């Protein structure tokens, strides 16, 4: 429903602009951007390719320092991404929580005591949280060991993805 997407987009943009962690940031509507700007957002990992290629009613709120981005109407209504250097997942989680808490002051999430947070994509239901790291592994990529490492990590419940996320190939030994 195009009107529903537009309403969600406008509400989220307005609500996110009041979140302290995003202060000074920019809300970008995909419909208003030229293709090269969309490509830059994807290259900087601030928006997914799916969001950039989608049409009406989608956008992204980017913090001033580009350490946080919130995609609106991508796979789910909101996708909060935070970035930190040096495998500092705790700092990234604190930033994501600050955005989430700020947004939740003015919005109500769909929540079930049985299933957790209800999302448009059923595989994201529950906490909706996924932690990811990007690593440069040139020695493993050049050796015959990378396939073994991927299989071993898979047995531990860890997914290895390409540089652009799910379903993408790695390039330059980035995983």
What is each PLM-predicted segment?
Residues 116-135:
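Conserved phosphate/anionic-ligand binding catalytic regions in large, soluble enzymes, centered on
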Residues 138:
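Phosphate-binding loop of NTP-binding sites
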Residues 1-114, 129, 141-143, 147-175:
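Long, Pro/Ser/Thr-rich low-complexity/intrinsically disordered regulatory tracts in eukaryotic proteins
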